[in-house]
Amino acid sequence: EPWGLYLWWLNLNGAFYFNGAFLGDGGRFSEPIARNWNKPFFFVLPASLWKPGDNEILIRLHSDPGWGILSPIEVGPVSRLRPDFELRRFLQVDLTRGLTITLLVASTLVLAVWWRRRHDPQYFWFGLACLMWGVFSTYLVLRDPPMSGPVFRWLSHLALDAWAVCMALFVHRYLGIRRPRQEKLLGLLLVGAGTLTALPALIWQGYAFMVTHTLTFMIIAWQALRVFGHWRKGRWREHGLLGIALGALLLAGLHDLLLALPLDNLPSELARIRLKYHFILLHLAAPIVLLFLTGHLGRRFADALYDAETLNRELESRVEA
């Protein structure tokens, strides 16, 4: 049975060699570097390349300064390694790409509804939230960005912070809350996040992202508490589904924050498990939750149209009478 080489993930790009023979790579090594940080690699090791005794695997790793990382590799029978590789690639690349496209279409539809109902800004903020997550998701699946890598990374992470702000403003409109000072503060936080992460000379960008994304998590938690407060008043049908959705985002976000903590002193076996398990849950949870809420808003919109048409018919019948 043929053997293969399986790499869980790396940052940002790599070229693979076996006993001096080229196996493949992830694309361009010049700027903008091909971005393969969210995909696994798998190569079959041809029987003709094996030799008695020691065999050499060489991986050329290329990344932006400070961002390079290489997970442990697995070498073994193809029948054992390929299923795990295929599942990981499906979840991290194929499914994420499909959800991103679907979410961008959904954001267009929601914004189109807002254009017809501009007196109801909840559709605007929710459509913009879907759009911001769609922009961030392109960072997960787009290998060759149309701009420099550092700029692409900065814009994508800023879109993630903007997503949280838009979600907060959507929740405010959904619940009928008006908090002008708090909403201005959210805008200032977004400006501050963009400024902090754009100054790598002041603080390493990875640490800056951890700070801003922790604030993102706190914003979502804040809105979940607000929805829970309204739900306790007995308005389950209106607020229960939104509360469940925000709760799912909170759990996924907490998982990802814990996964991103710099735990350098872990025992080697635990560190190996952590590297292999490095699966960002919010990448799947957020678009699924947003699509779920899109359907929920669509139902509310249809109910509102039905009620309006029913009222118009009743008024017309009274006028005719």
Task: Label each region the model flagged.
Residues E1-N19, I57-I59:
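Aromatic-lined ligand-binding clefts that engage carbohydrates, nucleic acids, or primary amines
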Residues A21-F41:
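Solvent-exposed beta-strand/loop surfaces of large extracellular or lumenal domains
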Residues G24-G26, L58, D64-S79, T102-V105, ...:
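Non-catalytic regulatory/interaction regions at protein termini and inter-domain linkers
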Residues E86-R117, M210-R232, P287:
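First transmembrane helix
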Residues T102-V113, L290-F301, V319:
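Alpha-helical transmembrane signal-anchor helices
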Residues M132-E314:
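Interfacial "cap-and-anchor" motif at the non-cytosolic start of specific transmembrane alpha-helices
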Residues R313-A321:
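Cytosolic juxtamembrane regulatory segments of multi-pass membrane proteins
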